[in-house]
Amino acid sequence: MSDYKSTLNLPETEFPMRGNLANREPEMLKSWNENGLYQQIRESRKDAKPFILHDGPPYANGDIHIGHSVNKILKDIIIKSKTMSGFDAPYIPGWDCHGLPIELKVEQKVGKPGHKVTAAEFRQKCREYAAKQVDGQREDFIRLGVFADWQNPYLTMDFSTEANIVRSLSKVIENGHLHKGVKPVHWCTDCGSALAEAEVEYEDKMSPAIDVAFTAVDKSALLAKFGLADYAHNISMVIWTTTPWTLPANRALAVAANVEYTLVEMVKDGQTQALVLATDLYESCIERFGAESHTVLGTVAGSDLELLRFNHPFYDFDVPVILGDHVTVDSGTGVVHTAPGHGQDDFVVGQKYGLEVANPVGDNGVYKPDTEIFAGLHVFKANKNVVELLEEKGALLSHVQIKHSYPHCWRHKTPIIFRATPQWFISMDQKGLRTQAISEIEQTKWIPDWGQSRIEKMVENRPDWCISRQRTWGVPITLFVHRETEELHPDSVSLMERVAARIEQQGIQAWWDLDASELLGDEADQYRKVTDTLDVWYDSGSTFSTVVAARPEFHGHDIDLYLEGSDQHRGWFMSSLMISTAMNGKAPYKQVLTHGFTVDGQGRKMSKSVGNVISPQHVTNKLGADILRLWVAATDYSGEMTVSDQILNRSADAYRRIRNTARFLLANINGFDPVSDMVAIEDMVALDRWVVRRAAALQQELLEAYDEYNFHLVTQKLMQFCSVELGSFYLDIIKDRQYTAKGDSNARRSCQSALYLISEAMVRWIAPILSFTADEIWKLLPGERGEYVFTETWYEGLKSITLESDLSDEYWDQLLAVRAEVNKVIENARREKQIGGSLEAEVTLFADDALSAVLEKLGDELRFVLLTSKTEVVALAAAPSDAIGTELASLKLSLKKSEAEKCERCWHHREDVGTVTEHPTLCVRCVTNIEGDGEVRQFA
């Protein structure tokens, strides 16, 4: 054989079989960075139509997790595929840099502001900490192969962004959406200040647990709801609470709309009265009240009780029944005492019903002087007085001491309270923001489409947005309010622009360093500076204006797409919608796409305690970023995204199939010159024309899938093409022609031309997903080309030509089916040691007339399609009884081992082996390919 080896066209490539991605990818990243790849891409799309994907900023604290990776990789796939589609798609990554988590980290190192460090020093430390966190996360994102302007990201703590946040707020104010109100916050009476969620610890505490009766104002209206006409005794609704001191601030009774309530008559100490209680709880309540007997009078849904009124147990006013989602029937009575000034749920539901936010308690935890009955008492001491008063009024149904978990101050270790304090709000209704926002939601495309109804419901039901915080590290609310009237300065908008100009130069510290007289002159004594900072959701929610509208890369274009996890309907999508509508009267985005959360193989949330966390760093170090990227692309992100080592190993297997296909393509177009060796599609062998046609059709499908962000469809169709049309059919068939045909014959060049066209197309198809591998392939493709595939557009060389004399796609589909049946028979014969390989087989196909016509079209070339040395087509009626049946009703088969000699060069068993005396071990076909003009192939 050694004499003839040099006459074969053996495959050869530098593209290694093993990806070795974990080691090779970092070298590529270095090269991309040194060559300014991102800038090259920007340059290549200079005047193209823009596509703007705006990056929702992750929080600058801690390492990135798998959810961050999913998010950034999805964005990167979109940016790259849009670039391939000819768009100018800049990607400016961002980070959210202000807020409590960073403050807490810095406090652990330097203590609280105002103690060992000044507030100014503390802010500087926060800035330094956030910058360091950004650096760490940036490296991890770059490692994923995400293309972005990494050296010029946006940070919400950039001086320019901080200034623009102030400008954004001034526009919201100018449009009339700001108002001052009150909101309950955690309050430590020892500190005399509000506490953030993170400053609250839960400890066990003994508290009075009481059941209190509120008597009906209009008994007949209540009875009518239960279908009753008359009742002689008192009727009350009963609440259960462990904070009797909040009863002076009670302004409503909350029930659950979809819970059933029972009117139950109770006799106790000879007294009869009827009580409204949740059906699921009334028996335990009656027992707790010590009833001697009871009778059920009727039942009704909670929703039917809405807006009925009941008397306050010790003040001279009545309160309504309201519906609240927070009401449960786990314990108590199923009716919740509602004091909007003393509870977050109470406040939210109270906003919906326009309830007064009563706050009778001062900073020090003592009732204010105008509090009826309890003025001057500390709230915790007043519990006893409230209980005694209820007993005196006959409103106390039960009273016990219970031990329960209660919020405490982390500094003083003392119980805290919820207390309404003055805050700044963006109003949902005073200028029609709610209505406008809902209208904008309808103009936006939501992917998946259930996102629309989800955010619509949230906007319909949300309270005013409290945008103020009492923190140190945040963008200040740069307002001056009148010391006596609390009114905003009439020139607030222009004053805010002057403050913004200073912040642009010096950062947010400029506000705290500012003396009011510098801007207000003689008026300074009448006004005070607001010391509150903005909710960090305002920082990120305003970036459509503070970043996208401000940065030159975006050329002032509208944003096409926001893409984040499904929790952001409540978060970034919401805050962005509110601010943009308040500022500009429109949504900031045209499309909003959400992806699900990552869960482990059993559908559980990732958790260190469970030990099921998969870190992106672990995956890139072990398998490589392209494997992680392939997993992201192949997973349907519209639901939960399941990840585990086993699932990632499956992605690695899928990757190997794609890599092996690419390797075969490269190895067989080695030395091919696309200028001089290319065979026109109309001159190709029919099978080659078919595969080019299939590739062209596939490209259309892939481009549509990319355009609709259906990346799992892209990977599915690509895998199908690599495994079935190419792997199991086309590539298998052409090996003989590719290796044994005359080197520059039409038979071989036709095949190479098809492989070249597929390679040019496929490297582009995979580039948005398998970026590292695409770059590796690109550098080994023959012909002149640009430095990077990423500056290219989708391949236009694929033509879908069907000649009149051609075999249709349906024809080849039939052949695929026949070949699959023949393969089964050959495999079986190999297993039973009847033959060694398929070329030892001679196959007879017993086919009906229709199928015979199909098979006979190929003449002697049918054997190349079936990978056998000899193939014969015979009428189905002539099939012997021992012929092998197939899944095709029109086909039976028989197989025998060839008795012909094996050609030393092509390994086919042919009767003409040795008939050319100069080449006694070769078949005539091989002699023609070595010494003659080369064999002619028409079909395969």
From Swiss-Prot:
Keywords: Aminoacyl-tRNA synthetase, ATP-binding, Cytoplasm, Ligase, Metal-binding, Nucleotide-binding, Protein biosynthesis, Zinc. A motif ('KMSKS' region) lies at residues 605-609. L-isoleucyl-5'-AMP binds at residue 564. Zn(2+) binds at residues 903, 906, 923, 926. Binds 1 zinc ion per subunit. GO terms for molecular function: aminoacyl-tRNA deacylase activity; ATP binding; isoleucine-tRNA ligase activity; tRNA binding; zinc ion binding. InterPro entries: aa-tRNA-synth_I_CS, aa-tRNA-synth_Ia, Anticodon_Ile_BEm, Ile-tRNA-ligase, Ile-tRNA-ligase_type1, Ile-tRNA_ligase, M/V/L/I-tRNA-synth_anticd-bd, Rossmann-like_a/b/a_fold. The keyword Metal-binding applies. GO terms for biological process: isoleucyl-tRNA aminoacylation. Pfam families: Anticodon_1 (PF08264), tRNA-synt_1 (PF00133), zf-FPG_IleRS (PF06827). It is found in: Cytoplasm. Its EC number is 6.1.1.5. GO terms for cellular component: cytosol. Its cofactor is Zn(2+). A motif ('HIGH' region) lies at residues 58-68. ATP binds at residue 608. It catalyses: tRNA(Ile) + L-isoleucine + ATP = L-isoleucyl-tRNA(Ile) + AMP + diphosphate. IleRS has two distinct active sites: one for aminoacylation and one for editing. The misactivated valine is translocated from the active site to the editing site, which sterically excludes the correctly activated isoleucine. The single editing site contains two valyl binding pockets, one specific for each substrate (Val-AMP or Val-tRNA(Ile)). Catalyzes the attachment of isoleucine to tRNA(Ile). As IleRS can inadvertently accommodate and process structurally similar amino acids such as valine, to avoid such errors it has two additional distinct tRNA(Ile)-dependent editing activities. One activity is designated as 'pretransfer' editing and involves the hydrolysis of activated Val-AMP. The other activity is designated 'posttransfer' editing and involves deacylation of mischarged Val-tRNA(Ile). Belongs to the class-I aminoacyl-tRNA synthetase family. IleS type 1 subfamily. Monomer. This is Isoleucine--tRNA ligase. It comes from Shewanella halifaxensis (strain HAW-EB4). The gene is ileS.
